[in-house]
Amino acid sequence: MAKVIGIDLGTTNSCVAVMDGKDAKVIENAEGARTTPSMVAFSDDGERLVGQPAKRQAVTNPTNTLFAVKRLIGRRYEDPTVEKDKHLVPFTIVKGDNGDAWVEANGKGYSPAQISAMILQKMKETAESYLGEKVEKAVITVPAYFNDARPGQPRMPAASLGLEVLRIINEPTAAALAYGLDKKEGKTIAVYDLGGGTFDISILEIGDGVFEVKSTNGDTFLGGEDFDMRLVEYLVAEFKRDNGIDLKNDKLALQRLKEAAEKAKIELSSSQQTEINLPFITADASGPKHLTLKLTRAKLESLVDDLVQRTIAPCKAALKDAGVTAAEIDEVVLVGGMSRMPKVQEVVKQLFGKEPHKGVNPDEVVALGAAIQAGVLQGDVKDVLLLDVTPLSLGIETLGGVFTRLIERNTTIPTKKSQTFSTAEDNQQAVTIRVSQGEREMAADNKLLGQFDLVCLPPSPRGMPQIEVTFDIDANGIVQVSAKDKGTGKEQQIRIQASGGLSDADIEKMVKDAEAHATEDKKRREAVEARNQAESLIHSSEKSLKDYGDKVSEADRTAISDAIAALKTASEASEPDADDIKAKTQTLMEVSMKLGQAIYEAQQAESGAAGMPPPKAGDNVVDADYEEIKDDDRKKSA
C-alpha cells in the first residue's frame, strides 16, 4: 500500500514526515535539511527555485523571491495588515482578479495558493525521493485559528499536483498527537504554537489514545515574520537617523535587512548580544554606506514586547472556553520556531505558572503529528481518536442584521445543526442566506463566508413558510450550508471552501503548469548530470593526452583534441542539451580508445622494466591452479 505522508506547510519553513514502523520520521530534503524554507524564486530566464536554493539567491534577486506568502491566504488587498506588509517586503503585493492579495514576480501575478502548490510539490518530491515510490495521499496541517474559510485552502494546490488530501488538521492538534501518542495517563495540556506567521493556543485532554480539543484561540497575523519586520523597522530608523537615507525604498537593502534581522533574532535566543554588519548597504553622493550595529537581547525584547504580550489574551480566552484554570494545565507544549525565544518562554511560564515542556522539536513536531494522523487513516496506527473543534461560531444573518448562531465556537467536529426560519414580509418569493463566522452580535461585524438565494417560494403571509437551514461541518473543518423550503421541497446549498480566487480553469491550468515544470526539472537535472560526467571525462582526457599523447599518431591526437573541444562547447552552453552532451561524450570516449590502449601498453612496459617480466599466458593458468591447490591444502590442514 502506498504511503500517506504528513506535511506541515509553514509560513517560514515546511516539513514532511512519514510513519516508519511505529514511529513518525521527518524526511530530509535534497539539500540534506529536515525543514525547507517556504520560499519560491523566479530567475530572469524563467527558472523556478524552491526552498533553500531560493533562499540562497534572495539577496541578489529580492523582487522575485517570494516568502511568507501563506500570510496572504484569504486576505483582501485592502486589508490593513496587507497594507503594512506591502511597504516592508522587497517583492510586490498586487490586487488579484478576485480582490485578494496576490504576489508578483517577473511581471506575472501569482495567488498565494499557486505559491503554496510550488512548495507542496517540493515536499511531495522530497517524500517520493525517500520512499522510492509515487506519493498520492497526504495529511496537511493548517493554523487552528483561521478566521474564515481558509481551512480548505490546501486542497486546491494539492489537487493541482495530483495529491489527495485525506485530512486537514490543526497545527496545535498535530503537535499534541506527536507529543502524547505514547502517553497513557490522562492529562490536560496547552499547546502554545507561535510559528512564522500565526499564533495558536489549544487546550486538549489527552490520554489512552484519545485526543480531545476542548478549545482553541489565536491570532492569524502574529508570528516570527512580525518579529523580523519589527527589527527591520528599527534598523531602517537607526540608519536613517545616522545617514539621512531611508532604506524602505531600496528593495535590495530590504532583503539584506530581512535576512540580517532573522539571523540576529535567532542568535539572541542563545546569546546576550550580537552584531549586525552590512557593508555597502547603499550609497549616496559621498560614497558607499555601511550598516554596523550592536544589538542586545534586552533591546530586541523591548522592540517586540507588545507582540509577545499579544499572545496572552488568546491564552486566557482558550482557558475560559475550556472551563479550566492555568493551574489545572498539566503541561504546556511549545511549538513553532518563535517559542525558542527566552522572552516568549518567560511569558508562558508566568501565564501558566510552570516551566513549559521543551521535549519536542518545535520545527518538526507538527509534521510528525500529521504523519501520525496519516498513519491512523491508513490503519498503521491503532487506537487513536482525534476530536477537534471549530474555532469560531457559525451562523446566518437574520432580520435586522442580527447574527444568529447555529454552531457555537469550540464545538467538536464533525457536527451538524439545523434550525427553522421564516420570511420577514408578505408574499416574499426569495430569501438570501448570508453565512458568517465570528463572535459579534451583528452579522456585519463578523466575517462573511458566502451567500446564496432560495428562490421561487410560493406567495404567502410573512412567517408562514418554513425554511430549514442546516450547517454541516466535516472533520476537515469544511462547512456546507443548505436551505430547504419544507412546503415545496426546494433546496439550495453552498460549500464554504476558499479557492484562492482561482476558477476551475485556473486550477486546471495549474495542474498543467505543475506537469510542465516537472518535465523541465527532469530535463535540467539530466543536463546537470550529463555535464558533470562530461567535465570529468574532459579532465581525464586532457591529462592523458598531455602525458601519453606521443604514444599515438598525430591524426589520433587531433581527433581527441577536436572531440574534447566539441564536448566543452556542448557542456558550457548557456542552455545545455543533455542528449547533445551525451552524444559528444560518447564520441570522445570512442576516439580516445587508442590513447587508452597506448596508456595500458606503456604501463605494462613500465612493469617489465621494474624486474617483473609479464608472465606468459600458460604460466598464468598454471599459477592459478597451483594457488588453488595450495589453498585447498590449507583448508585440509585446518
UniProtKB/Swiss-Prot annotation:
MF annotations from Gene Ontology: ATP binding; ATP-dependent protein folding chaperone; unfolded protein binding
Region called Disordered, residue ranges: 514-542, 605-638
Keyword flag Nucleotide-binding: yes
Lineage top rank: taxon: Bacteria
A Pfam entry, by short name: HSP70
Keywords: ATP-binding, Chaperone, Nucleotide-binding, Phosphoprotein, Stress response
Description of what induces expression: By stress conditions e.g. heat shock.
Residue ranges, compositional bias (Basic and acidic residues): 514-529
Similarity section: Belongs to the heat shock protein 70 family.
The protein's role, per its UniProt record: Acts as a chaperone.
Protein name: Chaperone protein DnaK
